[in-house]
Swiss-Prot record:
<comment type="similarity">
    <text>Belongs to the SNAPC3/SRD2 family.</text>
</comment>
<dbReference type="GO" id="GO:0042796">
    <property type="term" value="P:snRNA transcription by RNA polymerase III"/>
</dbReference>
<dbReference type="GO" id="GO:0042795">
    <property type="term" value="P:snRNA transcription by RNA polymerase II"/>
</dbReference>
<keyword id="KW-0238">DNA-binding</keyword>
<keyword id="KW-0539">Nucleus</keyword>
<comment type="subunit">
    <text>Part of the SNAPc complex composed of 5 subunits: SNAPC1, SNAPC2, SNAPC3, SNAPC4 and SNAPC5. SNAPC3 interacts with SNAPC1.</text>
</comment>
<dbReference type="GO" id="GO:0001006">
    <property type="term" value="F:RNA polymerase III type 3 promoter sequence-specific DNA binding"/>
</dbReference>
<protein>
    <recommendedName>
        <fullName>snRNA-activating protein complex subunit 3</fullName>
    </recommendedName>
</protein>
<keyword id="KW-0805">Transcription regulation</keyword>
<feature type="region of interest" description="Disordered">
    <location>
        <begin position="1"/>
        <end position="26"/>
    </location>
</feature>
<keyword id="KW-0804">Transcription</keyword>
<dbReference type="GO" id="GO:0005634">
    <property type="term" value="C:nucleus"/>
</dbReference>
<dbReference type="InterPro" id="IPR022042">
    <property type="entry name" value="snRNA-activating_su3"/>
</dbReference>
<dbReference type="GO" id="GO:0019185">
    <property type="term" value="C:snRNA-activating protein complex"/>
</dbReference>
<feature type="compositionally biased region" description="Gly residues">
    <location>
        <begin position="1"/>
        <end position="12"/>
    </location>
</feature>
<dbReference type="Pfam" id="PF12251">
    <property type="entry name" value="SNAPC3"/>
</dbReference>
<comment type="function">
    <text>Part of the SNAPc complex required for the transcription of both RNA polymerase II and III small-nuclear RNA genes. Binds to the proximal sequence element (PSE), a non-TATA-box basal promoter element common to these 2 types of genes. Recruits TBP and BRF2 to the U6 snRNA TATA box.</text>
</comment>
Length: 407
């Protein structure tokens, strides 16, 4: 978490502190909720000025060399220094060095595989786990909880420490990294606990458009039109190709995507609504998303902001962390924004076979017991068309993009 260079980290108890709107580092306005406004670029500059070259280096730290005979002779001087600091005898200092040395931090049997559970264990939890693992191996099944845990771990660790093949793509020392959580769309009612469905890492030097292009939303993949008379007709466009307008909202400013001629200013309606009756929201500003990087922003950690696309598909965006890059991070700039977490969604199955993911949704369907009703491609064609492809009965058919597509 981001920390105050003069005090504790962001996780500890904080108290309201008078601050201007362009502070250099996060101060917590409301404990456990969000910080006061601070400038992302100033935060990075502040830490780069406080830390040394060794702290900012992205090179792998060299392993400590084993002590030689000459170095071992320095133990007496170290014992004397410890004895002086603690006010104890040299014998007690030497005993402390032996008892509290680094060698004592090693566990017994470190060479053993921790995944192998011994047969003669007396620990009940290990016996239960061994039984579950044996059952999975015999039945070739993995329960959903274990599958999701493995999936989440792979998502978070697949790029750790990865370096670029091209040295020009190497992240610069002292680069800022922000953790951005994108929540489910506001109109998505399945998960009312408002959990994020994507967590990505972005660099402070990246433009807002790079985050915008990396966000995967099922609304962008929708296919317009009714296809009951021509189910084999290939759609010309998806929604993302037709409606390219979008905006981010951060601290009183709407950052509109204006990269394409067909892009509209989606924030204009909101601004006009706010100013029409002096609703007390102050003066909103507009800017071009492609002209700003995250280092240019003033933000609050933990505060809900907004990403809007497709006209009315709105996502709450929460920036939860800001820090400097570490040598263990992914150092390939081309992989950012880097997806680290993604919520696992249940897929909607075909109403007929109950096996395959739905590809079609029908309305006013004389063959369906529900309205709307979902079908996989095979069952849809088998039920609604004859062997020559002619339409049977009356119904309206629309291509369906399941949210589980992103699993």
């Amino acid at each position: 978490m981001a920390e105050d260079p003069q005090g504790g980290g962001a996780g500890g108890p904080q108290h309201p502190v008078p601050s201007g709107s362009h502070s250099s580092f996060p101060e917590y306005e409301l404990p456990e909720l969000h910080t006061r406004v601070f400038h992302v670029g100033a935060f990075g500059e502040l830490w780069r000025g406080r830390l040394g070259a060794q702290d900012l280096s992205l090179n792998e730290p060299q392993a400590a060399a084993q002590p030689t005979d000459g170095e071992a002779s320095n133990n007496g001087f170290e014992d004397a220094a410890v004895a002086e600091d603690l006010g104890c005898s040299l014998e007690a200092a030497a005993e402390l060095r032996v008892v509290c040395g680094l060698d004592k931090l090693r566990c017994l049997g470190e060479d053993e595989d921790p995944e192998v559970i011994p047969e003669n264990t007396d620990l009940v939890t290990l016996c239960v786990r061994k039984g579950l693992l044996d059952y999975r191996e015999e039945n070739i099944t993995i329960d959903r909880a274990c599958r999701q845990e493995t999936f989440a771990y792979e998502m978070e660790s697949h790029a750790l420490g990865k370096k670029p093949e091209n040295p020009a793509d190497m992240i610069e020392e002292g680069e800022s990294i922000l953790s951005v959580n994108i929540l489910y769309p506001v109109i998505f009612n399945k998960h009312r606990e408002h959990k994020p469905y994507q967590t990505v890492l972005v660099l402070g030097s990246q433009k807002l458009t790079e985050l915008r292009d990396s966000i995967c939303c099922v609304s962008d993949l929708q296919i317009g039109g009714e296809f009951s008379n021509a189910p084999d007709q290939a759609p010309e466009h998806i929604s993302k190709d037709l409606y390219k307008s979008a905006f981010f909202y951060f601290e009183g400013t709407f950052y509109n995507d204006k990269r394409y001629p067909e892009c509209r200013d989606l924030s204009r309606t909101i601004i006009e609504w706010s100013e029409s009756h002096d609703r007390g929201y102050g003066k909103f500003q507009t800017a071009r998303m492609e002209d700003f990087t995250f280092n240019d922003l003033n933000i609050k950690l933990g505060f809900p902001y907004l990403y809007c696309h497709q006209g009315d598909c709105e996502h709450v965006v929460v920036i939860t962390d800001i820090r400097l890059v570490h040598h263990d991070d992914c150092l390939d700039r081309t992989l950012y924004p880097l997806l680290t977490k993604k919520h696992w969604l249940w897929t909607r199955k075909c109403f007929v076979c109950k096996m395959y993911t739905a590809r079609w949704v029908t309305n006013n369907d004389t063959f369906a017991p529900e309205d709307p009703c979902f079908f996989c491609d095979v069952c849809f064609r088998m039920l609604h068309y004859d062997s020559e492809g002619n339409k049977l009965g009356e119904f309206l058919a629309y291509p369906y993009v399941d949210p589980g597509t992103f699993n």
